[in-house]
Amino acid sequence: MKTLTALARQGVALFLLLAFAGGVSAADTRVGPVTHLPLPRYVSLKTAEGNVRRGPSLTHRIDWVFKRRDMPLEITAEHGHWRRVQDRDGAGGWVHYALLSGARTVLIEDDMTPVHSRPDPNAPIVAAFELGVVARLGDCTDSWCRISAGGYRGWVPKSTLWGVAPDELRD
């Protein structure tokens, strides 16, 4: 009887441990119910114009129109063929998935951001990008990202970009 009680306690302890551990990992990893991709995540606008609707269907009112091809957007929710997105300023709504691309772009957040030849603040500067420039996103280390725009390519501090998560690594 004593052995059965000890085994029962161990079983309960193991159950609680697994239940707690499972809850932690589920809270840390949020995925979209449609694509099973991480939420939030960044994408870009595939077209020159994209209607932003109040809800996830064609019957919902168009609140405004995004008018910048390749503009980075953050997906915060999914519903069927619709994605709730927001831009750098937090403006957003629901956009049909066909208007979005997985090609990653970023927005330059600081005026005249120096673009370096290597991920090093002492590396030669190959260009300077103005505030609001949209650039293609390449590799990212813990604090630098490689970007390209207007025929120029180089590295900028990740903190000068919108459209990439602070802890995101890319290669």
PLM features: what roles do these ranges have?
Residues 57:
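Intrinsically disordered, low-complexity polar regions and short flexible loop motifs
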Residues 13-14, 24-25:
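Cleavable N-terminal signal peptides
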Residues 61-62:
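Beta-strand-rich domains and repeat architectures in extracellular enzymes and scaffolds
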Residues 26-54, 65-69, 76-79, 86-91, ...:
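SH3-family beta-barrel domains
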Residues 1-12:
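Bacterial N-terminal signal peptides that target proteins for export
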Residues 20-22:
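N-terminal signal peptide c-region/cleavage motif recognized by signal peptidases
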